[in-house]
Amino acid sequence: MKQYTIKTIDHEVYQLNSTTDNEQLTINTAHPKWHVVNKAACSAENRLIKINESGRWTSLKDYNGVYDSNPTQPTKPVEVQLQKLDDLDIDDSLFESMQTGTVVDKFLSTEGGFLPGTNINIAGSPGVGKTTVLLELLSQLHTQGKRALFISAEMNQIDMARYLKRFPRWGQIPMLFLGDYCDHNPKAALESVLEQGWDLVLTDSFTEVNDTVKEESNMSRSKTEKWFLDLMSKHNLGSNKLKKHTTFMTILQLSKGGTFVGSNKLSHMATAMMYIKWEGNENSNRRYMEFVKNRVGQVNKKLYFNLREGINFDEARYTRDLLNDELVAEERKQLE
């Protein structure tokens, strides 16, 4: 039995590399086992091709991390430096929030608005309005002079142009359409544009960015994810031309089971995790946003909105719900 890793040459050609020797196999659409290799290559997880003694081809999950393994290198002593928070040189701009001028500011953080150098993941069902509501918030900050960027890996220029009549403010937001670079090093394109320095970046979506870079750069899924998370962390810290402590809003896709697509590292490394959901039946026009994790603000508070003639946040309901929560909390204290 032999096992092979899969390397994508282009959309119709794959290269199989033996895990035990230097053997390489080229598989194109004319190969009788094309469908086996193509299905494995398009899987959401890293898979290996196994060829047994009888000549049968199957695929299996990379349980042993073959794709991520590297030749063993001599280990060097690690020099560890401990730090004290009092000794850190903290940029005061990290505490200057970016406010949209809407009730969303109260919803986002206790300071009000987006905080520099933070990462917010947003998940929700298709069609619930994730991109629409987040782009509108982005446009409000752009109008105020903030450097705002939209990275679109799902929609092209024509898709976005259809929104202009309803949301004219979107017309001046700088946008990177990653599909334009599918065959021209999308990894370098992303690194280059982020190096310019931005206050706030909206990415739609993490999965599509990951898949685009993974395919063109021949990286494993886990390595691509690590690269993108490291890239965000770099710009959180202000390592760009303008020394901007970039805040990232990243849209995540949902699986059929209702969980976000990606590793748990996505959730653990995020400052906040938000869901945008329907209330009641799908397409009922009753939608709400809710944080299930938020290091800089409240969780489990619902902010309702609708998309009738633009985006309308139900500030009265949000304020009323907060007041009710305070009254309930006060009553519980008195009973204790």
Predicted features and spans:
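The Walker A/P-loop phosphate-binding site
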Residues: 67-167
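A short beta-strand micro-motif
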Residues: 3-9
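Catalytic-core regions built around general acid/base machinery
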Residues: 137, 226-241
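Phosphate-binding/switch region of NTP-binding enzymes
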Residues: 237-336
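Short, mixed-charge low-complexity intrinsically disordered segments
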Residues: 34-71
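Conserved inter-motif catalytic segment of the P-loop NTP-binding fold
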Residues: 144-230, 320
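Structural motif
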Residues: 121, 200-204, 249
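A short, exposed loop/beta-hairpin motif centered on an aromatic-Gly-Thr core
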Residues: 12-24, 29
